[in-house]
């Protein structure tokens, strides 16, 4: 069976821009995500 192409092509700049802290702080929903992760005690808040 033929498998599909590798879909994960790591790129640190894109990772930060799409999931990073500054992007999260931009929107109300993003700030809520960071707050929830702080409440839960996550070591990593964002990418």
UniProtKB/Swiss-Prot annotation:
Top-rank lineage group of the source organism: Bacteria
UniProt entry keywords in alphabetical sequence: Ribonucleoprotein, Ribosomal protein
UniProt-listed Pfam families: Ribosomal_L34
UniProt key word Transmembrane: no
GO cellular component terms, semicolon-separated: ribonucleoprotein complex; ribosome
Record keyword Ribosomal protein present: yes
Biological-process GO terms, alphabetical: translation
GO MF: structural constituent of ribosome
Family the entry assigns: Belongs to the bacterial ribosomal protein bL34 family.
The protein, known as: Large ribosomal subunit protein bL34
Annotated organism of origin: Corynebacterium glutamicum (strain ATCC 13032 / DSM 20300 / JCM 1318 / BCRC 11384 / CCUG 27702 / LMG 3730 / NBRC 12168 / NCIMB 10025 / NRRL B-2784 / 534)
């Amino acid at each position: 069976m033929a498998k599909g192409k590798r879909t994960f092509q790591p790129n640190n700049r894109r990772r930060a821009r799409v999931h990073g802290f500054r992007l999260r702080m931009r929107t109300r929903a993003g700030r809520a995500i960071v707050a929830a992760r702080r409440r839960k005690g996550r070591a990593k808040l964002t990418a």
